[in-house]
Design a protein with these regions (language model features):
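RNase H-like, Mg2+-dependent phosphodiesterase core
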Residues: 1-209
Length: 209
């Protein structure tokens, strides 16, 4: 299926497969945003959608423009049975590593759902530390409506945080690179130094110099 920002995609096949196996239950999609950047928290979102809901333009957040993600963000919140956004901050990332921090953020998001989820469909191939019944789905953000919705909530929430950080520290260019390791970001770090929001475990070589 080709990405389509104006039409509607039916992304319910994976959820329906689970419903057929497990019975009708409250199923949440879970995804994270910001595993790779040099700065800021890693965010996760969990979303329970009404069964069969088709939102025009819903897709993997990476396939959508920033404008489209921002437009879908309140629509997902409005239509969802439940949704939650959580994170693990840069200190936690440095202490427990990024993989464990990703899973911690996901578990926190799932735990905040009200009503609670009875089954989680998690993007990727790792469900370590997830306490509720779950299944992982590689490239789930482009295959599952629930995960696609979660990917948008997580991405938009994190991008908003980085824009606020840019207002506090405009010399680093966070609004543009969103904390990723661009040449401009590395140059800013060399010129101005590390901020508390930088992930030291990602920047050991720079700290050593």
């Amino acid at each position: 299926m080709r990405p389509n920002e104006t039409g509607a995609r039916d992304l319910w096949a994976e959820e329906e497969r689970i419903f057929a196996r497990e019975g009708t239950l409250r199923l949440c999609g879970v995804d994270e945003a910001g595993a790779g950047p040099l700065a800021g928290a890693v965010f996760a979102a969990a979303v329970i959608l009404p069964r069969g809901l088709v939102l025009p333009g819903l897709d993997d957040s990476k396939r959508l423009t920033e404008r489209r993600r921002e437009a879908l963000f309140p629509l997902i919140q409005e239509k969802a049975v439940a949704w939650a956004v959580a994170w693990a901050d840069e200190r936690e990332i440095d202490e427990i590593n990024i993989l464990n921090a990703r899973m911690l953020a996901m578990e926190r998001a799932i735990a905040q759902l009200d009503p609670p989820s009875e089954f989680a469909l998690i993007d990727g191939n790792c469900g370590r530390g997830i306490s509720c019944p779950h299944e992982t789905l590689v490239k789930g953000d482009s295959r599952s409506a629930s995960i696609a919705a979660a990917s948008i909530l997580a991405k938009v929430s994190r991008d908003r945080l980085l824009r606020r950080l840019d207002e506090e520290h405009p010399e680093y260019g966070f609004a543009k690179h969103k904390g990723y390791g661009t040449q401009a970001h590395y140059e800013a770090i060399r010129k101005y130094g590390l901020l508390p929001e930088h992930r030291r475990s990602f920047l050991k070589n720079l700290e050593a110099k």
